């Protein structure tokens, strides 16, 4: 059993993009920014507990940080982890529906 404190730290924010909204409409998949050290099991447990929906599968990937310039200084943004969470049939979770 994963502790509740950990579950609250796993999910960072919804990732809102054109690709994410298309995935929600077509395949009932939500896209989330998650903690870099989060596992698929932790992500699944956190989504099920916090949003009270049934999760079918979780796919994750690490997004590499971009190199950015500020004047002559060159810096790099941090890497972050993205999770595609597919919900079971009949389940619904809409982050961007009210934005229209």
From Swiss-Prot:
Disulfide bonds, paired cysteine numbers: none
This protein's record includes keyword ATP-binding: no
A Gene Ontology biological process term: translation
Record keywords: Ribonucleoprotein, Ribosomal protein, RNA-binding, rRNA-binding
Gene Ontology MF terms: rRNA binding; structural constituent of ribosome
Entry's family note: Belongs to the universal ribosomal protein uL23 family.
Subunit structure: Part of the 50S ribosomal subunit. Contacts protein L29, and trigger factor when it is bound to the ribosome.
Name this protein carries in UniProt: Large ribosomal subunit protein uL23
